[in-house]
Amino acid sequence: IRDVLAGIREHLDLSEIDAVLTGYMGDETLGDIILQTLTDIKRANPEALYICDPVMGDIGRGIFVREGLPPFFANKATPAADIMTPNQFELGLLTGKDVLTYDDAIAACRQIHDKGPRIILVTSLLTDGTNNDEISMLASSHESEHYVVTTPRLSFNPEPNGSGDLTTALFAGHLLHGRDLKAALNATSQTIVKVFEETKHIQELTGSRELAIIQAQDYFRGDKSSSLS
């Protein structure tokens, strides 16, 4: 990864980088290399954003990364990040607290905001008050803005990979294009629902576990309506 980043430096002025988005990492050593590079990018462009998807685990699966990564995300990546996009399980890991209710989630977000990130998107949230056929996303800002959107929860067998990556990328893209927190959340959730619906349809026909991002690409471009019913 050092060689890849060195190659990028040779062909790109770091001041032209508007954002750095990270997801799954193999180990904390890779994370340290990324944060070192991030320091150089922010020195060249102080307005550049670091969007961190702290991939560590999920409800029902537990932790599925190496043992050094949870403390890396909690103690190093969180203070460096401008935007974080944990799922409910990861939100609990980052704060050391159970997240079972909406109030728990708000309190956990506040705890993370206090470490540095000004925007948090909880990419999946199932609280005690959530119906089994629904799932929520929560967007929070350090200015105490909180928005929740609840959408249908589709069942998959097997579960497709990459939904968190897609959600983070969409949300970051909307923010970088000037949408406010509420608008970015709504636009992200609308597209995710359409991708999941298309994925569900294809899985029923073929058994594929791949997200249908190609088949649903018109919703990314805005060529089709993606309004929630």
Name every feature range the model reports, one short phrase each.
Residues 1-59, 63-64, 209-228:
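Conserved N-terminal subdomain of the carbohydrate kinase-like
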Residues 5, 9-12, 38, 42-45, ...:
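Structural signal for hydrophobic packing residues in well-ordered secondary-structure cores
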Residues 26, 56-58, 90, 125-128, ...:
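Glycine-rich beta-alpha junction loops
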Residues 65-147, 156:
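Conserved phosphate/ATP/ADP-binding segment of small-molecule kinases
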Residues 92-93, 158-181:
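Short, small-residue alpha-helix embedded
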Residues 145-147, 174-188:
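Phosphate-handling active-site elements
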Residues 182-229:
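Charged C-terminal helix
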